[in-house]
Amino acid sequence: MAGDSRNAMNQDMEIGVTSQDHKKIPKQARDYIPIATDRTRLLTEGKKPRQRYMEKTGKCNVHHGNVQETYRYLSDLFTTLVDLKWRFNLLVFTMVYTITWLFFGFIWWLIAYVRGDLDHVGDQEWIPCVENLSGFVSAFLFSIETETTIGYGFRVITEKCPEGIILLLVQAILGSIVNAFMVGCMFVKISQPKKRAETLMFSNNAVISMRDEKLCLMFRVGDLRNSHIVEASIRAKLIKSRQTKEGEFIPLNQTDINVGFDTGDDRLFLVSPLIISHEINEKSPFWEMSRAQLEQEEFEVVVILEGMVEATGMTCQARSSYMDTEVLWGHRFTPVLTLEKGFYEVDYNTFHDTYETNTPSCCAKELAEMKRSGRLLQYLPSPPLLGGCAEAGNEAEAEKDEEGEPNGLSVSQATRGSM
C-alpha cells in the first residue's frame, strides 16, 4: 500500500518539459526543471471537440432565430445600418442617394411636362420653370445639381415658377437630412473601435499553477500599439451548464470570476503584457476542481477587456475565451519583458509560450485543508520553481529511508520540525 501510494504521489508530482521548450524557460530556472518523462500527461488528450460559446476572435456563436417582431430593427434604423456589413452598407448608401435623385428628377420633369415646357424647347419667348430642361435626363441632372449643391450651370430655375421654388426648398431640406443621416452612418462605422481591438492580444492558453502558495488561474493580455488604452479593465466569466437542486437545468450559466475586483487589480495599466490572475479560493468556481476533474469538466472561460481609445475617446472592447482543453494545469507563462539599454523590450514571439512547473494535482480545497490540518505542505526555497503537496505517513517515510530514496517534495512532520 505504501509503495502504491508513493508511486501515485511521484506520478502526480513528476512533471517535466521537453528539450525544445527548455530554451523558453527563464535562465535562472532552467537548471531546476526536470526533463519530460513518459508519465507526463497532456490535458487535451481524450477530449472531444465541442461548440464554443465565443470564438478566440471574440465573436459570439449565438444566432437569433424565429424573431417575430422584426419591426423593432426598423425602429432603430441608425443602429441597424451601422451594424450592417460593409458591402450592404455601401449598397444602401448608393441606393438612398440614387433613389432620391431619381425621385426629385421625376418631380422636376413632371412640373415641366404639366407646364408645357417640353413643348417649347428652344422657344426664346417662352419662360420655362427650369431653363434648358428638355427631358427626363436633364431633369435628373438638375436634381443632382440641386441636392448636392454643386452649383447651377447650363440649367437654372426661373422666378416665374412658384411650384419649382417650393420644390427647390423641399429638396434642399430633405437632401440635407439624407446627407446628415448617411454620412453620419458612414462616419460612425468607419470610426468604430472594433479594429482597435485587433491589436489587443490574449494568450492562446490559460494556465493553473501556484502563485504565493495558492493555486491561481492565469492568462496573459497585451497591447501591440504605442497609443495606450485608457481606463482599461478586465473581467472574466465562467460559462458552464448546471442543474439546480430543484432539478432545473440552466444551459450556459454565467458565473463571475474574480480577477481583482475587490483589490482593484482588474484596473490595468496596459503598457506591457500583463498576467491576469484569479486566486482559486472558497468563492471561486474552481475551488473543488482538481487536475483529474479538469480533464473531465466541460466549461468555457470568457474574458473581456474594456477601455477607451486614447486617440478618439471611444470605448473599445476585446474578447476571447478559453475552453477546458485550453486550460493547462501546472504551467506558467514564459517572461517576455527584458531590460535593454535605456528601455524595456517586449518579445511577442514568446507571448503565448508556457513552460511546465511542478504543481499539486489536488484541488485548492484539499490543499487548504491539508495546510490547516498540519499535514505536509512544503515549498522548497531552492529551486524556486518547485513546490508540491502530498501526505507523508510514517510508514511511507520509513520505506523511503530503507530504499535510500530522497524525500523529494514530501517531508515528514518530524523532519519539518527539526528544520
Curated annotation (Swiss-Prot):
Keyword set includes Transport: yes
Intramembrane region coordinates: 136-147, 148-154
Main location: membrane
One MF annotation (Gene Ontology) recorded for this entry: inward rectifier potassium channel activity
BP GO terms, sorted: membrane repolarization during atrial cardiac muscle cell action potential; potassium ion import across plasma membrane; potassium ion transmembrane transport; regulation of heart rate by cardiac conduction
Comp. bias regions, Acidic residues: 394-405
UniProt xrefs under Gene3D superfamilies: 1.10.287.70, G protein-activated inward rectifier potassium channel 1
Positions on the Extracellular side per record topology: 112-135, 155-163
Transmembrane segments: 87-111, 164-185
Matching PANTHER family: G PROTEIN-ACTIVATED INWARD RECTIFIER POTASSIUM CHANNEL 4, INWARD RECTIFIER POTASSIUM CHANNEL
Name of the protein in question: G protein-activated inward rectifier potassium channel 4
Naturally occurring in which organism (per UniProt): Mus musculus
Lineage, highest ranks first: Eukaryota, Metazoa, Chordata, Craniata, Vertebrata
Protein's gene: Kcnj5
